[in-house]
């Protein structure tokens, strides 16, 4: 069943779950550049989510917030499941991870940090999709 998904996609998901967000971005961006249609918008959202987390972890809060909002805009329309992942679960976890930053009104917050226990994971609907 997982043969229907490109190897780059599976590798990108694996890297995301290992919190290798910049590397995830690189792998998925290569696939994104070759993709057409609705899958392209979905991949763009995953790329934005990975870089939002990368920025958050590096305390680039403005970049993190901006890319979080862009990722949500691109991923929200895809429903509960898409391209073999439990998207609604991921988006709930993604929002929970960013909630403190989103609620903060300071330009340069000093009390906000990416909390390891809140970093979202991508869960698959297809066995073996994420290695």
Protein language model regions, located:
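Alpha-helical segment of the N-proximal tetratricopeptide repeat
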Residues: 7-23
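TPR-repeat structural position
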Residues: 21-22, 61-62, 68
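TPR/TPR-like alpha-solenoid helical repeat scaffolds
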Residues: 47-48, 80-102
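Amphipathic alpha-helical segments of tetratricopeptide repeats
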Residues: 25, 29-33, 72-80
